[in-house]
Amino acid sequence: MELTPREKDKLLLFTAALVAERRLARGLKLNYPESVALISAFIMEGARDGKSVASLMEEGRHVLTRKQVMEGVPEMIPDIQVEATFPDGSKLVTVHNPII
């Protein structure tokens, strides 16, 4: 199977998000890369489901809370930008202050 660099990036991100979900389910607090991966995967899957950019920008702020991440992580992530594939093409989704 041949994958483009973009497809490899998406696969790596999705794998990191799965690890983050499992750690969260075990009650562990997420670190920076796990937090970014989980929120980014949520946005990518929402786009695939046909949600709007505006709804993903809002919903992306409620994926994680401060109690679910390690100390200092929310301050390290002022914004998350994800280029997601929607039914009508690729769009950039920006989530400001994603961990509240």
From Swiss-Prot:
Give a GO biological-process term. Answer: urea catabolic process
The record's subunit annotation is: Heterotrimer of UreA (gamma), UreB (beta) and UreC (alpha) subunits. Three heterotrimers associate to form the active enzyme.
Mainly localized where?
cytoplasm
Localized where? Answer: Cytoplasm
The reaction(s) annotated as catalysed by this protein in its Swiss-Prot or TrEMBL entry are: urea + 2 H2O + H(+) = hydrogencarbonate + 2 NH4(+)
Name by which UniProt lists this protein: Urease subunit gamma
Q: Which family does it belong to?
A: Belongs to the urease gamma subunit family.
